[in-house]
Amino acid sequence: MKTQTPFAELSGGRLILAAFVIALSNFMVVLDTTIANVSVPHITGNLAVSSTQGTWVVTSYAVAEAICVPLTGWLAGRFGTVRVFIFGLIGFTIFSFLCGLANSLGMLVFFRIGQGLCGGPLMPLSQTLLMRIFPQEKHAQAMGLWAMTTVVGPILGPILGGLISDNLSWHWIFFINLPVGIICVLAAMRLLRVAETETISLRIDTVGLGLLILWIGALQLMLDLGHERDWFNSTSIIVLALTAAIGFVVFLIWELTDKHPVVDVKVFRHRGFAISVLALSLGFGAFFGSIVLIPQWLQMNLSYTATWAGYLTATMGFGSLTMSPIVAKLSTKHDPRALASFGLILLGAVTLMRAFWTTDADFMALAWPQILQGFAVPFFFIPLSNIALGSVLQQEIASAAGLMNFLRTMAGAIGASIAVTVWDDHAKVARSEMVSNLHTIEVQNTLLQNGFTADSTLGIISNLVDKEAITMSANHVFLLFAMVFVFAGLVIWLCPKPKQVSGMPSH
């Protein structure tokens, strides 16, 4: 018997092509969350900025994307799911082109914000559209396709970013979106019009949205600029901190009292949701901070090319792809708190392994923690998502999922900023301590006896001290993140035991 599709115009080859276009669009957006990670040293070198400033290229995209996630439902209801999807694709493609043309950090960050704002709605809308064009009995396969692109994107991102940066230039990590974006836009306009949703006049919480942008923007600016401006010795950093704190409090009060809040914070009344999202945010912040820091350390200290840094970073992909379906099945049969706790503590152990990395570590010594991390990530991500969405009422699932994704993305941006800032700050402290304890004359004499000139010895010593200081600082960051993972793994036990493990929705 032939399966009836929701839309007669979308069946057979056209349905498969439409699904491919939607999945490819999601893949392109997800890819851009990690493709720039290994290219940061190339970008900072080309634009003559510090590594801390270079990280803004990653965090600006993540923050802009996070801000747009809560607006997706309103945009789709007001203008139509397909229209918003196509408009987002067009904007994402245009801003990708502009990112490639950028010749200053300010321009690049500005265009990355535009890219994130346009790309933010594409991920949830791609999920919605796949569910919409496939019949009910094919929804599992549709979500499998969506999940595959969501998982594969971050794995291929570092590899593609490294290959492109080494063999072409960093500009091409953005230019490669052009042909993909144009094809997806044209195909979506041709195929998806029939799947358009009805539009209704919806009120938007403009005050809440403004407050959200205000406190998030102030917080991220404080984290990104704090290092350069000597933190709270700077008036501007104090102003940003006060703006973020006051803005957050006013935002909470407003959202709790508004009839149509941009973010439904009332779902935090469910203890299971509040605790699981806290653990998820802590875990993802430490995870994303690590994967932003590692490629930079490899290239700065171990003389890895961007390509090889990408290969090493991507070794975690095998475990993630292998374990995701297994963990999804285990989550229906076992207490997800135990699975999540196991995953988070395993991530803590893996990150602790990195805290003992040295400048003479070989590829496999560096790759093993990455491989083990790949196996651990599904254990914390899938069960925590299930606990969170299984703790709220049926009618609250959509807003809870949006809020969870928003906080996860924000935690990633904050984690990346903290990682690079602490790394840079502690490197200066470590260097100062090493220099004060270094017997320079003895080292110089040893180098002179080995044929080095007097002029070159100081440069060699300085370079060695810098490398060791940067590595010690990276070890310090990994130790802090290991503690965060373990703390999150213990906190999850404060969640009430799920009443029906098998009945919880997966995400």
Residue ranges and their predicted role:
Residues Q53, K138-L145, E396-L403:
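Cytoplasmic loop-to-transmembrane helix junctions
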Residues K2, A8, I183, I387, ...:
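Hydrophobic transmembrane architecture of multi-pass small-molecule transporters
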Residues V40, G153-S165, G415, A419-W423:
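Small-residue (Gly/Pro/Ala) motifs that create kinks and tight helix-helix packing interfaces
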Residues V69-G208, L225:
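Helix-loop-helix hairpins in multi-pass membrane proteins, especially solute transporters
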Residues G13-G73, G77, V82, S96, ...:
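Transmembrane core module of solute transporters
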Residues L186-T206, I253-V262, V429, L494-G503:
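Helix-loop junctions on the cytosolic side of multi-pass membrane transporters
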Residues V29, Y61, E65, F92, ...:
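Structural signature of transmembrane alpha-helices in multi-pass secondary transporters
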Residues F97-L101, I182-R190, V249-I253, L352-F356, ...:
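Membrane-embedded alpha-helical segments of multi-pass transporters/permeases
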